[in-house]
Amino acid sequence: MPRGFLVKRNKKATPVSYRVRSEEDEQGAFVAQDVPCARRPVSPVQFGNPETVYRAMYSPTRPVSREHERACLERRFNLGSPISAESFPAAPNCSDQAPVDLKIGTSNSNRTGTTVTTKRPASDTERKGKPASKKAKAMRKLQFEDEMTTSPVLGLKIKEGPVEQKPRSQCASGDKPLGEFVCQLCREAYADPFSLAQHKCSRIVRIEYRCPECDKLFSCPANLASHRRWHKPKQSAESNKTPAPEKEETSSDRDTPSPGLSESGSEDGLYDCQHCGKKFKRQAYLKKHVTAHHDAPEKPQSHAPLNLSASECHLCPVCGENFPSRMSQERHIRLQHSAQVYPCKYCPAMFYSSPGLTRHINKCHPSENRQVILLQMPVRPAC
């Protein structure tokens, strides 16, 4: 067996001539001594085939035939080690490729290590984050339950419970312990649910809102605020100094005047009593005060309504003159203010504006009943 046969199979992928083998053996030995990475086991290609020695007699730089080229390419592709892939490996090339293999190995190992280490802390943080969120939800629920201590609609409030509570272990009779029906506020136990529902808890306090003007009690502040609007005078009544008494009467029916106001009055009132000088916020309060404390009720000077048939006063709506009876008032209007009066042709009503007379005729005397009323009405003598 020739000297360079083993070196050719172990170190070189392609066969070379015998003239170069002596130099390459020295270089291969130098590389094997200096570089430890070249000691990797290389999978030999075509092991034990002596025909490769005879084909290597040709020059490695220039193959003689295409079959030799094809064999060289197949050997290069079938090699497993990157070091043996070249036909003429040198010492610097081998030293460059060895650390590359080491770097690849270390980089792969580092990558796998980093991936494992990065996944583990992420899972730890996720596991730690879940109980924290549950604690936050529990704290929210506790705070919400603590805030539910008042009921503004029902007017109830729950007092703070005592620090030390002594639960009852047995009932009064001592037969069996009471723990099934217990009040959650005062911790008092009862034998049946009916007695638990009927008991009055000591921690529940009823809140009452009192009106400062009429002393009425309300359980809700919103109801008190809506009630106090009735005590305030309307701005429209202040702007219009001649309010209609019919509207005032309807509004006074809805109002509930307080006894304190009717007796003592208020300083901010708009209506003055002519007898005692007291002021009242509403005309209904003044009327009640006059009827209760003074014999001859008198109303403050105000314009009378246009329709005299529905009114109770006897003032002339044009000049304001007072008359003892209604007949004298109508006679005065016919004689003195005949040009400003619009009498109704179908009834004795009189109006002081054309739109008022028209509205009265359309409402009280429709077109179907006008002729019947005309036949029944007596002829009015001219004055």
From Swiss-Prot:
Residue span of region Disordered: 99-141, 229-269
Molecular function terms, GO-annotated: chromatin DNA binding; DNA-binding transcription factor activity; DNA-binding transcription factor activity, RNA polymerase II-specific; DNA-binding transcription repressor activity, RNA polymerase II-specific; RNA polymerase II cis-regulatory region sequence-specific DNA binding; sequence-specific DNA binding; zinc ion binding
Residue ranges, compositional bias (Polar residues): 105-120
Subcellular location: Nucleus
Basic and acidic residues bias locations: 244-256
Entry-linked Gene3D superfamilies: Classic Zinc Finger
Positions with biased composition (Basic residues): 130-140
UniProtKB keywords: Developmental protein, Differentiation, DNA-binding, Metal-binding, Neurogenesis, Nucleus, Repeat, Transcription, Transcription regulation, Zinc, Zinc-finger
Chain intervals for the UniProt region annotation (SNAG domain): 1-20
One of the protein's GO biological processes: regulation of cell cycle process
Biological role: May act as a transcriptional regulator. May play a role in neurogenesis and neuroendocrine cell differentiation during embryonic development.
The name this protein goes by in its record: Insulinoma-associated protein 1a
UniProt source species: Danio rerio (Zebrafish)
Upper taxonomic lineage: Eukaryota, Metazoa, Chordata, Craniata, Vertebrata
